[in-house]
Each structure stands twice: as structure tokens, then as C-alpha cells.
Amino acid sequence: MILRTILTFSAVLAVGVASAAHTDAPPGRYDYTAKVAAAGAAGKAAATKSNEPEEALALADRTYAYVAKALGEAALKDEKAELEADRTWLAAAKTERARKTVEKEIRRLRRRILFRHPDLQFKKLLAVQRGIPYSRENHMVDQYLGRWSRPGPGLVVLENWQTAPKKSSLLGGKLPTGTVINPDLHWNADRILFSFCDHTAKPPADAQKLKVPEVIVRDDPWVKKVDPAHPIYGPGYKAGGERAVAHRRYFIYECAADGSWVRQVTGCPGDPMETQGGRQTAMIEDIDPCYLPDGGFVFSSTRGQNYGRCHWGRYVPSFLLYRADAGGKNIRQLSFGEANEWEPAVMNDGRIAYTRWDYINRHAVWFQSLWATRPDGTAVSHVYGNYSEDIGVVTETKAIPGSRLLLCTASAHHNITSGSLFLLDPSVGEDGLKPVTRVTPEVPFPESEGWNTPGAYCSPFPVNDTLFLCPYSDETLGYPDYHPRHRREEYMAAWPSPAAFGIWLVDTLGGRELIYQDPEISTFNPIPLVKRPMPPALVSTLPPPDKAPDTGLCYVENVYDCRSELPKDSIKCLRINKLDVMGACRRETLNQHDDLDLHKESLGTVPVAADGSAQFRIPAGVPIQLQAVDTNGVAVFTMRSFIYAQKGEVQGCTGCHENKFKSGAAKYAVQSPAGRTTYDPKPEVDLGYTGPFSFTKSVQPIFDRHCISCHGLGEGRRPAFSLVGTNGVYNLIKRKQISFVASYRETRESKPYDYFAAASPLWKKVKRGHGGAKLSKEELQTLALWMDLNVTEFTVGGGYSWNRPESRDADPAGETALRAAVREALGEKVAAQPFDALVNRGMEERSRVLWLVKPEDRDRFLRLVKASLKPKPAQDILGTCGRDDACECNSCWIRRGGYNDPKRLQPTKIR
């Protein structure tokens, strides 16, 4: 018998109810016997003490059968004899005390039997020790920024891990104080990739003069003990205030599995530090490195210089997928989303699984789903969760050895990555709970099944399809108030303790065995230090870079092959919309009606053939949305996600959001089908400008010409509301004249004619000539396009920036001069009209006053119109506002500080 005291609890999964087992909790830790939970959404439940010994015996029986299947019963004859003796002992036990004594022995025997399994016979276990990241906002993306990192010992090795784990530092002080996250062990078990944040790196000399977004630093007991000179506590921190750690960031490093060498791979000499579009609006940070079978590696990075739209000006740049050759050479962008795409992992077929946050005209919280791509960035496809709200964040995906199953963590949008574990079978379905098997039903799926529930798993590693190594904490990883800025002290007090997470062995039999719990700091990312089979290396299907066009080719076999039934023969064309990413930290109101709306630019339409097929080109390297458009020029069906193409890529699908389990998997080919004509998008109307659609430039002139004489200027019958200027949009929405997708009030998935022009009373009115207005075909199509793009308002000439021309104020002196000239030319009545009835703030040439004056006076009045508007405060510089000390975009400090300048890099000092 094993006499050592162990900490363990079991869950009886067969009946779907978790129950507590005996526990001897270490001093200062929670008593796990008081923590039990019902499966799924039921959450916590009281322990049933009367049947715990019988449950322990049933678990031991299942464990014996499982291990005996692998080893043979002869190898376990001694354990079988002990199990039968314990069964007899339990039957004879009469008192609760006696039954508890037997239960303890049964659980010890069960642990010993389990550890006999051949897949658990490795000698060493790799892990990471670090503090738990935190920020002023409890959000899933903040944790990956170095500024919020908490230091720790880093990479450690646990020897004798089954019985009495002995911890040792892998790198033995080769790296300075800092934080290691998300290591990846090569299949040959000879080297390790990991992300590291160097806490000894210094900010630029003039950093305190820069307008740097605020950072809050909490007291850290581990740092205080081992590094009292750390900036958290030193005079430098007090002098520098909260900005002292804002420069910290993660880069990628590689080391030998035996710790004999370590090197920096990114953020060091040789890294060109190139960013998308040359923007300099976010510090480059690299995380989530993952080896590829072709010799390179994939990782997530802020090199795309994007931001999510719902962070309210916080410094939270998006991470997108990149790849590099061995040693960090030839870095290339793989994904082009507008929000985060992260946590890449190689599946058994050689493709890369990753998590995508996707809220294109849909809820910003519930859709962090699982996607896959080939290692060259082609053939992007949905794996699970794009239509489902059952699991909010599907992440930390790992392929099960020798299986089609994937091990995933169901995590929360408003928390660090942790939650409940489940197995996913993509062959069963791509949404809902049918393809999901819960591994830890005692922990609810965070947010979708409950908020602030106790217990959380994270960074799991599958030993096989039954056994999983995984950190676990019984603490509540949440905060009392939904928005912590209002009750920050309470929020901070509720944050997990430094040693919240320890390593456990979790199994689908119903058992939970503690492997290692450090009393001072949390332990994450357990990985057996053994070789594993390498997945196949997928050869790139792309043309050589010097021969690749700047476009990709897409084809659709049949737009009518759809989850929702589309009206027969209704689709005339596909509209190709380019999604405009938010390239800076700070932005003003995006739209009056929806502050989280995404800006879009219609590139034009491509025809759909009679058989429902279409083949067309799209620009490479940008996110694209598709809309199926009918013969009236209005959207029938709208994609609420996006596609993108690599240069020279050929990609295809069966239909519009087709069910691949009904129609077969989405097609992928190196060449397009023969005999089809390939079209380039043709603009529906000539907007007269490039970039995202602008209400002020395109729709206001239509209202000015046909509507405001009644709706705003008081001519004829007094109207119920005004359409003068952008207030007209608000008035139309208030009176439910236009149908749009409002953030946090969206339907879960697209349906035919559900929103936009076709569902808007305004569209029906202008079509039938409301009020005698006779709009041209081009004007009608412009209105339809505006509504189909979700009633976009402010975009062009700065996009999400505060620096857009549509937001320019009137210049008092210039307005006075303009009105004087109007009074002389057109009379007092016109001169007294609202400023927005005379001047178009976004495009002066389309100002209404220019239509009213004589042709020979237009040039003079155009000069007066331009003088009546204040100039934009500044011109953008590499994506920033360029105002430096008077910065309004919260990003100028990146450029001024030279954070992405390869000549100013500070490589980590490796000993």
C-alpha cells in the first residue's frame, strides 16, 4: 500500500454527476472535499458522504479494467487481489470512520493502478512556473501582453513525478528575471520553443515623456521574495509610476530540452520587425510558438498592428498568425483577421488548428471558435463553434495521439484562459454539443453556463484519449463586478492567489490525481519529455513569391447550397466587401447607431451563373465579407465572418455557409475548375472615392437633393423628423425606418433578408417614390449599398481615427463669410439654413450650396466651403495621429520610442 498522503478527488462521469473524494489539503489551501459540482450548468453541489466509498470502489474498478486492457490482467494480479480485499473490507465496515479508512486505501490503490499504464511510463515532466497575469480589465486578450505578465522560475522539470516530484530549473539561470508562457516541445523531444518576457529590459530613455497607456502593477509575493530589487518594488517604479512596465513584451526563444543552450529567435538582430502596412501603432510581441513538421514554426504576433473594436481605447493590439523558418528566418503573415487569431497547434493531419475571435455584425462575446489552416496559410476552414453559443471560447486545442479527437479548453471571454475541458470530434459536427464530450463536467463552461463559478482547468496536454495532464485551480477565477473599473479594489482582491494552479492527471474514467502543487507559485503547461509521432509535412500549394499575383482566386459551386433556404433563382451576384481593420488604439464613436460596428468597403460585385456558381478574384492579405445580392441590388444573405487569401491561392466552397456534413467538406484545390470565367469585382456605383463607405460623402447628398426640403427645411407639409446631416441617421433609426445589426442584440446567424435594405421601411418608401422623390438608379443603388453595409456613417479619411474629415467642425469666420455670400446670391432664407444643409463636411465638392448657385459661381463658392471647415488636426504618420505629446490616438509612443525599430532592439542578455 502507498502510505504517502495524497490529494485527490474523483468525479463519477458515467452518471453525469461529480462527487468528492477524500482529501488531505496542504496548509493554507482550500479543502477540496468541500468543493464538488454537478455536471454542466448545474455547477456546485453538496457532497453525498454516504456513498463516497462505493464511488471510489467503482472508479477503481473502471481504472483496473482500463489499465488491464493495455497491460493484460496477469501484470496486475497483485493489484487485483488488493482490490478484491478492499471490496470485502468495505462490505464489512459498519461505521463511517471505518468506511472512510477503506475509501482512503481504495483511492491509493486506484492511483497506483492508474500509474501502471504504459503511456505514463515517462521519466520527466516539463512545466512552466509563473505568476498569473492580470490587468485593469479582466479580458481574454490582455493576458498575452508582456506588460501584464508576472515573473516566475520559468521552465522547470519534474522528476519522479508520479510519487515524490523533484523540481529543477531547466535553464539554470541562463535567462534573467521574466515570464515564460506556452512552451512547445519538438516531436523529437530535443528542443523547446517558448515565449519569454524579459523583465530586465529597459524602456527608451525618454519613455516617461511619452504618452503611454496606463498599467497597474500589483504586489507580487514571489518577486518580493526572490528579487526584491525588481522594478515593482524599486525606487524606479515609484518614480516612473505605472508606465514603468508598459514596455515589457514577449518574444520567442528556443532552448535544448536538456537546458544546455538557449537562444532568442525573434525580437533580436536579424528580425526585420516588419509590420502590416508599415503601421507603427502597437509594440511587436510574439507568443504561442508551435513547431511545424516542415522545419519551421507558427506563432501569434501583433505585427499586424490591428486592434479589436470593443476595447474602448485600451491598449490591446490583436494577435494574428505568422510563420517563420527555423531560427526565425523569413517571417510571413498567415492570417489577416481584424480581431485575435491565436493558440495555434498542429493537428494529426498536418494542418494548424487555432482560435479565431470573430464578431462581424454579431455578438462580441460568444464567438471565439476553432478554425484550421494549412502551414502556408491556405485552405482556411471552420472546425467548430462558428454558429454555436454553447462554448464561448474554444482554445488550447491539442490533437489526441492516434485519434481524430481534439482536446480543448472551454474558456471565458472575460477571464484568463481557463475553464472546463472537453473532447471534440470534428467528424460528428461543427456546432452545438453533439460533437462534444465533457472531460470535466464538474466545472461549467465559463460564461455560457455560469459566471464566477469555482474551479478551472487550463493548458492541458493529452497523454492519450483517456489521460490528460492539466493545471487546475479550485479558486473562483472571476471578479465580483462585471466591469472592474467601477470596483477595482474588490476586483483585485478577488484575483487568484499566486499558487492557485497545480498539475493534475485528469481522466475520462472519473478520476483526478494531484501530481504537483507548489505552495508559492502556480505551475502550468505540463508536457511529458518524450518523443512523439510527427504529423505529415504539408507541401505548400502557393506559387513562388516572385511569381505570385497580389490576388487570390475564389469559387463557389452553388450559392443555393445553404443552411437557410434561399429563394430560387433570386441571387444575381455576390458583393465583395473589404473589411477595414482598426489600426490604432484610440478611436472616437464609430457610428451613432452602433459604436462597435465594422467599417466596410464594397469592392464591387461578381455575377452568379444560372447554376448558382461564381468564380472571382479577391485582393490577397485582407479580410473579405461576401453578400449574396438579388436582382433588385439588395443583400439576400450576408456572411458574418470573413475569408482571406494568400497571394496566388485558389480556394473554394460548396455554397453559402453550407453544412459540410450534408454536402461534403468544403473544396480546396490548387487550380480552379476548368471552363469557368473568372471575374474581378465591378463597382455597383461610382462613389468617387476609395476606402470604406461614408454616409456623409455618399448618402447625405441624396437626402440633400430629394428629402431635406420637407425633412428639415420646413418646406411643404411639416415632417415628423429631420434628415439634415448625420442626425438624419439617428432619426431614421429612432423611427425604425432602417434595419441594422446592433451590437449585443444580433441574431445568432444570418437568415435570408433578415437585416439591411430589404428589411428596411426606408427602402420600400424610396422605391415607390415617397413624397414625390424620384431617385436615379445610381442613387437607389447607393442607398441600398449603405443599408447593406449596416448603415455605416463615419469612416473615410481616417477610418476609425478621431482624425476623419467627416468630424471637422465649422470655422466661425469661414462660416460667416460663406453665409454672407449665400445671402447675396440666394437670399436670406437659404443663408439661414443649417450649416449641414449647405456644406458636406466629408466631401466639399458634394456640398448642397454648390448645386444652388450659378455654374459660373461654383469655383468661388467651393473655396468658401473649404474655408468654412476647420482643417484636420494632423496628418497620420505610420498609422498614428502624429501629435506626439498632444497625442489623441494612444499610439504615437510606439513610433516615437522606436519600439519596432530593428536598430534599437534590446536582445535579452543570455548567460
Regions found by a protein language model. Give the residues of each.
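Aromatic- and Gly/Pro-enriched helix-to-coil junctions and flexible linker segments
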Residues: A21-K44, T48-N51, R62, L83-R108, ...
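Residue-level detector of Asp-centered blade-edge/turn motifs that repeat once per structural unit
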Residues: L120-Q121, W187-N188, L292-D294, M347-D349, ...
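Beta-rich catalytic cores
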Residues: Q121, P151, T179-I181, N188, ...
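Short, conserved, GDST-rich strand-edge loop motifs in beta-rich repeat architectures
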Residues: K123, A127-R150, S195-F251, T275-G277, ...
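Conserved beta-strand position repeated across blades of beta-propeller domains
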Residues: L126, D184, C290, S335, ...
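A short loop-to-beta-strand structural motif that recurs across blades of beta-propeller domains
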Residues: G154-V156, F251-Y253, L320-Y322, S369-W371, ...
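Multi-bladed beta-propeller domains
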Residues: T163-G178, A257-M283, D325-A339, R374-V393, ...
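Loop/turn-rich, solvent-exposed surfaces of beta-rich toroidal or solenoidal domains
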Residues: T355, T395-W504
